[in-house]
C-alpha cells in the first residue's frame, strides 16, 4: 500500500519567493569529480593520486555528456517537486517516488502527462542521482513497481512499427542522391547501415581507426574481401562483417571507400558534415538525427508507398527502417541482427 502524503497548499506551487534549494543545482560535473577518491589512510600517494584522475575519467565515460545532463535535469525536477510539497528528496523513499511517478502520469495542474517511456527515463535519472549521492533507489520496491505497472497498463501504448526498407527500396532511394560530396557520404551511410543492420547512433559513432576520438563508438577496417566494423555496445564490443557487393553501385565497401577518398578522411569520425559550399568535409561528427532525416527525405524523393500521405510516410520510415530491412531480407529475428 502506498503511503499517503499531505500535499502543500496550491498557492505554494506557484510562489515565486520559494527559490531553488541545494538539491536542485545541476551539479553533474561536481558529482563526476567527487565520485572517485582515495581513502583517507592512503592520502598523499602521488602514484595513487594519478590513478584517481584516471579512474574519474573512466567514470565520466560511463555515460555520454547528453545522458548525464538529462539525468541531472531529472534530479533537479524531482528535487523541485519535493520542495513544493514540503518533502525532502534524501534519503531515497520508494513511497515518495511512487507518488512522484503517479503525478507525472496524471498531473493535477497544467503540466502535460508524461508518456511511459519518459517516466521510465525519469526513474533512470533518479537512480543515477541517488547513486551519485551515495544512496540507492530500489526500483523493484512495491511502492514503485506496482505504481509503474499500473501506469504501463493504463497509459502504455504499443510501439509504432517502423516500415522495413527492402533492397529494391534502397536502390530507389540511392538513385535520388546527388553526385557530389554529400551524395557520396549519404550513399555510404545508407549502404553501410543497411548491410550491417546498424542503429543510427552506431553509424555516426564509427571512427576511421581505433581510439581516434574520446567519444568513439567503434572503428572500421577495410580489407580486400570486405569491411570489419567493431562497435561498442551496452554489453561490450561486437564485430560486424560487411561483404563487398556484386557491383560498385550497390557495394557498401566501395561506397565507403569512395567517401573516404574524396572527403580526404584518414582520422577521426567516419561520417562528418560537409562545408556549406559542398566542396570539403569538416571534422564535425554527424548527429544520429541526420540518418533519420536522410531516410525520410530519400523515401519521400523515391516515392515509396505512394498510397500513403506524406505524414504517414514520415511516421512509418525512420532510422530503424534500415535495421528492420536487413532483418526482413535475411528472414531473421531483428534481435539477432
Locate each region found by the language model.
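Extended, non-catalytic subsegments within catalytic or DNA/protein-binding/adaptor domains
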Residues: 1-336
Amino acid at each position: 500500500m502506498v503511503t499517503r502524503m499531505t500535499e502543500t497548499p496550491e498557492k505554494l506551487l506557484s510562489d515565486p519567493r520559494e527559490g531553488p534549494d541545494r538539491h536542485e543545482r545541476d551539479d553533474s560535473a561536481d558529482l563526476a569529480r567527487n565520485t572517485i577518491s582515495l581513502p583517507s589512510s592512503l592520502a598523499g600517494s602521488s602514484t595513487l593520486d594519478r590513478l584517481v584522475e584516471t579512474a574519474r575519467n573512466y567514470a565520466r565515460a560511463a555515460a555520454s555528456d547528453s545522458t548525464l545532463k538529462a539525468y541531472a535535469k531529472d534530479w533537479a525536477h524531482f528535487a523541485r517537486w519535493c520542495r513544493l510539497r514540503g518533502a525532502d528528496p534524501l534519503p531515497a523513499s520508494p513511497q515518495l517516488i511512487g507518488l512522484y511517478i503517479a503525478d507525472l502520469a496524471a498531473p493535477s495542474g497544467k503540466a502535460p502527462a508524461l508518456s511511459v517511456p519518459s517516466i521510465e527515463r525519469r526513474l533512470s535519472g533518479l537512480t543515477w542521482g541517488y547513486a551519485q549521492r551515495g544512496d540507492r533507489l530500489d526500483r523493484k520496491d512495491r511502492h514503485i513497481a506496482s505504481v509503474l505497472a499500473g501506469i504501463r497498463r493504463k497509459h502504455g501504448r504499443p510501439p509504432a512499427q517502423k516500415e522495413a526498407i527492402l533492397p529494391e527500396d534502397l536502390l530507389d532511394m540511392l538513385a535520388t542522391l546527388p553526385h557530389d560530396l554529400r551524395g557520396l557520404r549519404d550513399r555510404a551511410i545508407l549502404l553501410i547501415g543497411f548491410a550491417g543492420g546498424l542503429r543510427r547512433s552506431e553509424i555516426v559513432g564509427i571512427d576511421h581507426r581505433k581510439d581516434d576520438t574520446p567519444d568513439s563508438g567503434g572503428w572500421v577496417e577495410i580489407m580486400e574481401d570486405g569491411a570489419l566494423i567493431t562497435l561498442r555496445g551496452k554489453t561490450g564490443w561486437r564485430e560486424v562483417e560487411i561483404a563487398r557487393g556484386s557491383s560498385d553501385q550497390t557495394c557498401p565497401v566501395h561506397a565507403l571507400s569512395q567517401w573516404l577518398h574524396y572527403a580526404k578522411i584518414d582520422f577521426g569520425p567516419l561520417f562528418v558534415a560537409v562545408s556549406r559550399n559542398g566542396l570539403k568535409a569538416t571534422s564535425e561528427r554527424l548527429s544520429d538525427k541526420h540518418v533519420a532525416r536522410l531516410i525520410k527525405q530519400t523515401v519521400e524523393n523515391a516515392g515509396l508507398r505512394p498510397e500513403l500521405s506524406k505524414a504517414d510516410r514520415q511516421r512509418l520510415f525512420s532510422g530503424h527502417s534500415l535495421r528492420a530491412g536487413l532483418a526482413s531480407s535475411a528472414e531473421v529475428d531483428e534481435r539477432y541482427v
